[in-house]
């Protein structure tokens, strides 16, 4: 038996008047996901337990089969693992976004989806100018980077994800509580370093958003995981452009497969990801394939971009993997789902249950649900499930 878990980050949404009160999933052309729903079993999954914020860290940890109530310690330490940054017992890792501030407001949480090459120059400059015995900077991908603070600094600081406060006044959401003043000062110091940096001057000349500030959030200590093999008896791999997902995979003992051209945006290498997944399953039991683009489009509030991201996910990820599964001599089980909704109307994550569909190529008792979307799956046989139980269900379907 082979297993494929296909995650369209942030795909779920709310009904949109412009689409005749349908969601984007309902309006999008998604024949591959519809086929999986029609020939498989469907339901709704709660990926965010009560008391947890609806972050991709919590939601994807659940999808990977790890209960956040047991394993979650913060987002940034997971990203640190993917970046090869080892954390000491008293190290606190922070996500460090490169953002755009304009007229005292957070204009763009991603600095115009700045390129990794430009971002690395800026982060290296920040590390050179602002690094101390207390904090170190590490470059990541695009706008997503890392700060590591020693001696438990910032462990209890109250921070807000920048994608939750786009358009809001920066000063209203600076880090608060214990050590908040230190990290607020670090943010302010970063603007001095970045504002007139040659990379940003060039971006402004080109009409792009400058990366003129950092923003810290998502901090935590290194978590302790049981491996996926220990929990579920399966070998596996993760394919994603995003350090968070790769970090979860590393802690779970999964192989991390790097795909050239995987960007975490609409221009990602879909075909490369699908091919890598098919190749990975030749020597492993299970593969997770994660696509970030629908989530990014949701944060931008773009109906058109989110529609395209979902349709590309369906035609360029789900479809080729489904066709491979159906042509294979081995039995395949495919799970398709988002991790959480990222509605374009609110431009951030919500904690609503998400639709899922499970299809086994030799199954004979499908639910007969016609479409894969937030409403149709409610007619499936699986009901409402705890997402961290899904992997266990998957290997038993």
Curated annotation (Swiss-Prot):
It is an enzyme of class 5 (isomerase). Its EC number is 5.4.2.12. Pfam families: Metalloenzyme, PhosphMutase. Catalyzes the interconversion of 2-phosphoglycerate and 3-phosphoglycerate. The keyword Isomerase applies. GO terms for biological process: glycolytic process. Belongs to the BPG-independent phosphoglycerate mutase family. A-PGAM subfamily. It comes from Methanosarcina acetivorans (strain ATCC 35395 / DSM 2834 / JCM 12185 / C2A). The lineage of its organism: Archaea, Methanobacteriati, Methanobacteriota, Stenosarchaea group, Methanomicrobia. This is 2,3-bisphosphoglycerate-independent phosphoglycerate mutase. One of its GO terms (molecular function) is phosphoglycerate mutase activity. Keywords: Glycolysis, Isomerase. It catalyses: (2R)-2-phosphoglycerate = (2R)-3-phosphoglycerate. Signal peptide: none annotated. Pathway: Carbohydrate degradation; glycolysis; pyruvate from D-glyceraldehyde 3-phosphate: step 3/5. It comes from the Archaea. The keyword Thylakoid does not apply.
């Amino acid at each position: 038996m082979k297993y494929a878990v296909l995650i369209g980050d942030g795909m779920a949404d709310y009904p949109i008047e412009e689409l005749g009160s349908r969601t984007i999933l309902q309006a999008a052309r998604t024949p591959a996901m519809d086929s999986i729903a029609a020939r498989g079993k469907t339901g709704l999954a709660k990926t965010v337990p009560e008391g947890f914020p609806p972050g991709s860290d919590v939601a994807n940890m659940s999808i990977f089969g790890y209960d956040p109530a047991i394993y979650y310690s913060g987002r940034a330490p997971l990203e640190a693992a993917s970046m090869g940054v080892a954390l000491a017992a008293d190290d606190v890792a922070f996500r460090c976004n490169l953002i755009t501030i304009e007229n005292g407001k957070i204009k763009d949480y991603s600095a115009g989806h700045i390129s990794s090459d430009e971002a690395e120059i800026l982060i290296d400059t920040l590390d050179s100018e602002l690094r101390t015995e207390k904090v170190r900077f590490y470059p990541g991908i695009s706008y997503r980077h890392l700060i590591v603070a020693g001696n438990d600094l910032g462990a209890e600081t109250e921070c807000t994800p920048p994608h939750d406060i786009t358009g809001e006044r920066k000063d209203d959401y600076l880090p608060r509580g214990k050590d908040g003043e230190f990290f607020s000062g670090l943010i302010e110091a970063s603007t001095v370093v970045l504002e007139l940096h040659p990379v940003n001057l060039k971006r402004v000349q080109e009409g792009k958003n400058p990366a003129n500030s950092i923003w810290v959030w998502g901090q935590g200590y290194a978590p302790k995981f049981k491996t996926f093999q220990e929990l579920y008896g399966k070998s596996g791999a993760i394919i994603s452009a995003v350090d968070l997902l790769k970090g979860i995979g590393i802690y779970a003992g999964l192989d991390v497969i790097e795909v050239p051209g995987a960007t975490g945006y609409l221009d990602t290498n879909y075909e490369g990801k699908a091919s890598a997944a098919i190749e990975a399953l030749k020597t492993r039991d299970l593969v997770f394939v994660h696509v970030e683009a629908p989530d990014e489009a949701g944060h931008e509030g773009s109906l058109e971009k989110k529609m395209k991201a979902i349709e590309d996910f369906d035609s360029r990820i789900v479809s080729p993997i489904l066709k491979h599964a159906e042509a294979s001599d081995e039995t395949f089980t495919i799970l398709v789902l988002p991790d959480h909704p990222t509605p374009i109307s609110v431009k951030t994550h919500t904690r609503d249950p998400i639709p899922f569909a499970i299809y086994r190529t030799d199954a004979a008792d499908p639910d007969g649900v016609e479409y894969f979307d937030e409403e149709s799956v409610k007619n499936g046989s699986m009901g409402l499930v705890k997402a961290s139980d899904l992997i266990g269900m998957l290997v038993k379907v």
